[in-house]
Design a protein with these regions (language model features):
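Nucleic-acid nuclease catalytic cores
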Residues: 91-118
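Conserved catalytic cores of phosphodiester-cleaving nucleases, focusing on short active-site segments
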Residues: 56-58, 64-75
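Charged phosphate-binding loop/patch that engages nucleotide di/tri-phosphates or the phosphate backbone
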Residues: 2, 6-13, 127-150
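Acidic-basic catalytic patches of nuclease active cores, encompassing PD-(D/E)XK
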Residues: 1-47, 61, 150
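Sequence/structural signature of beta-propeller domains
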Residues: 80, 116-123
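Hydrophobic/aromatic beta-strand patches that form the interior of the parallel beta-sheet core
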Residues: 43, 68, 99-101
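Beta-rich catalytic cores
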Residues: 52
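Mg2+/Mn2+-dependent nuclease catalytic core
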Residues: 73-93
Length: 150
């Protein structure tokens, strides 16, 4: 099996059992940040406090903030499980550096503009053009230039 067919053989290791969860995607992104050499402050947000707020707040070295909503697609579905609260938050903050980051079954990471949340929920991510798609080995510097600009 190739690394794309078997997450256990992937060069981008995440904790065992979490490859198909948002926490596994977050672990992978954190590892990428460390390897990039950037000094990005991160906060994993608790959605129970304010429904719909994205999963991660990033603060670039310049002090600029951005938000990441993390999603992992486990099956063949192309629609994302974005809640009405998440769509509302991302729509209200359209124009801000807010992103929906999706890891699919092939382990590719697609980055979408947060303003596309409603379309992603209703029509699926095959109907919305991503800002970028990152395949293994991931180019974390480019990923961070997009999602956490200076």
């Amino acid at each position: 099996l190739t690394s794309l067919q078997n997450p256990e053989k992937s060069k981008n290791k995440v904790p065992s059992g979490s490859v198909n969860r948002e926490s596994g995607l977050w672990s992978l992104i954190r590892q990428g940040m460390k390897s990039s050499g950037r000094s990005i402050e991160t906060t994993r947000l608790e959605s129970w406090a304010v429904p719909g707020v994205p999963d991660v707040l990033l603060c670039a070295e310049s002090g600029r903030f951005s938000f990441l909503e993390l999603k992992v697609v486990r099956d063949g579905s192309r629609k994302l499980a974005l809640s009405a609260h998440q769509c509302a938050w991302l729509s209200r903050h359209a124009g801000s550096p807010s992103f929906v980051v999706v890891r699919d079954r092939s382990l590719a990471i697609s980055v979408f503009d947060g303003a596309a949340a409603v379309d992603l929920r209703m029509d699926g991510f095959s109907a919305v053009a991503p800002l970028a798609v990152f395949e293994e080995p991931y180019d974390w510097e480019e990923f961070l230039k997009l999602t956490c600009p200076l």
